[in-house]
Regions:
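Bacterial N-terminal signal peptides
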Residues: 7-15
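Low-complexity intrinsically disordered segments
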Residues: 1-2, 12
Length: 124
């Protein structure tokens, strides 16, 4: 029974770690190393957010979809999970929630960088 319990615990830990590893990746765009979501879409931070707290909801979140964290997702190095007021969870890099941008149409697009002087690419 101990072997089964230990095996199950190891499986659960590896599954949680894989959620983290599958949520984002490093990419090189225009000679710069950045973070993207699993589909290669550029990730951004929002100056109006606080560490560990998203302030992007409603229309903001429609235009800047949060990088959602799966149930059971765990922090990984500089990455953490933020609870949103709508009950969902999202990823944060160095404590800052991260988002994609609706106007980025294909991997490598960086059209959200500098929008309103408050959106910035997450650099790796």
């Amino acid at each position: 029974m101990k072997t089964i319990t230990a095996g199950l615990a190891a499986l659960l830990l590896s599954t949680a770690a894989s959620f983290a590893a599958d949520a984002w990746k490093e990419a090189e765009v225009n000679g710069a190393k950045i973070y993207t979501d699993a589909n290669g879409m550029t990730l951004y931070t929002y100056d109006k957010d606080e560490k560990g707290k998203s302030n992007c909801y409603d229309k903001c979140a429609t235009n800047w979809p949060p990088l959602k964290a799966e149930a059971g997702a765990k922090a990984d190095d500089e990455w953490s999970v933020v609870d949103r007021t709508d009950g969902t969870k999202m990823w944060a890099y160095d404590g800052k929630p991260v988002y994609t941008f609706i106007k980025d149409k294909k991997p490598g697009d960086v059209t959200g960088d500098g929008v309103g002087e408050v959106w910035h690419i997450v650099k790796a």
